[in-house]
Amino acid sequence: MSNPRRALTLVPHTTERQTMKDFKSDQEVRWCPGCGDYAILAAFQSFLPELEVPRENLVIVSGIGCSSRLPYYVNSYGLHSIHGRAPAIATGLAASRQDLSVWVITGDGDALSIGGNHLIHALRRNVNIKILLFNNRIYGLTKGQYSPTSEQGKVTKSTPFGSLDTPFNPISLAIGAEASFVARTIDSDRRHLTGVLRAAADHKGAAFIEIYQNCPIYNDDAFATVTDSSSRDEHVIRLEHGEPVRFGADGGQGLRFGRYGSLEAVDAAGSDPDSLLTHDAHAADPSYAFALSRLDSSDFAHTPIGIYRQAPRPSYDELMSAQIEEARQQQGDGDLAALLAGSDTWQVG
């Protein structure tokens, strides 16, 4: 089992016993009945005691959207910030305060529309923040417009004749930005969700988690193919590092590389065992993880969940601290007043 304290070496540790109740605020939870956000919140609150971090050293930053109400409901420091800018704010916190465990809560609209630029650069820089993207493939807060992840042809209030847009694949986007940790999970699979949260907390650097989240009001059953017991075994591909990739009701299907480096589903029994894929989440080159992400399709025929990529590299805050320390050793402590005064000043008159 991963140790969610490992990436928190500079964050204070508490020996005080914590429970889920300690991380519940006094605020009334105000999401629509049946919203998948309730399940995510409960899993998150029940996981937080594992971090053994004092509440005052835990910070949750969100943008704008239904999911972004989550900081109100967790008894810690938090910030309900500007639309799309949560990764930028979290970057400043994580880079300047390594004694904090910083989590970002965002949605498919907040992160991938107005916030897309901030998201990819936080991932590229490998800032030590954990980003949870609640993907319901719709704008819920503004009452049901299409989002950057809505499928092509989606009829909504803002696309009455069907969306013309090709949707973002959040996993492909994160891997393309060379995020060092990329995973997907589902709101209704609490055990899997908690396991992914644990692994993300254990990772030093930026962690990106896409969570399929059902919106029962404006996009109900958007992920029914991968959540209903009657269909999920045929379509969900569970990724476990070092394990053969098998799926299907009887585990009879596998994956292998086809032409041009793409992955294809094949009958495992009728294939050369050496050609079948064993999952390697630790591959340094992101090409393999990207190929996995391209299995996605609008009908969820083959949908991997789990950790796609877990390839550690130095985090931005570590590199920044080392650079500052080296500069201090070479030039001494800085003088802010002298810096502001500058060397090229003069008086007039």
Where are the language model's segments positioned?
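ATP/pyrophosphate-binding catalytic subdomain of soluble kinases
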Residues: S180-V236
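Flexible, low-complexity linker and terminal segments
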Residues: S2-R17, D26-Q27, I217-G349
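Glycine-rich beta-alpha junction loops
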Residues: I64-C66, N136-I138, D189, Y212-I217, ...
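Conserved thiamine diphosphate
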Residues: T19, S147-A200
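Active-site-proximal loop->helix
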Residues: G116-L123, L141-K154, L173
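Thiamine diphosphate
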Residues: S2-G140, T194, Q323-G349
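Short beta-strand segments
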Residues: V61-G63, I105-T106, K130-N135, E210-Y212, ...
